Amino acid sequence: VVARAACAAGTELERAPVIVVPADDLLDREPQDTVPDHYLLYWSDEPRQELAMGCGLLMIYNHSAHPNVEFTDGPEPDTISVVALCAIAAGEELTYDYGVELWFKEAAHPKTVRRKAKATKGKKRKR
């Protein structure tokens, strides 16, 4: 995902609905690593609201240990907002920190961005 236009820190870049997925609805199978597993986010500690699948572009943002966006609670129920952590140039890739132990090797990234503490919502589900 890349920025179509330059934007300032704090800009909401996307607001997307989520589909809440109760943890009990996941199938107990081997191997655990299926395609849908890659697209589940932590959502809530509330029973039957533990996970969510993001709609819109949410599930195709790449990971970076030096992200330029974060996922926050959206203003409407069952939504996530993507918010710029710093000024972003037009054409710059938008990345967020998955917040879990990575299952792939991360490439070096020259840009360092200071980021706010992250809430639990929006972190990739640890598999």
Give, region by region, the residue ranges found by the protein language model.
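Conserved catalytic SET/PR domain of SAM-dependent protein methyltransferases, capturing the structural core
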Residues: 1-127
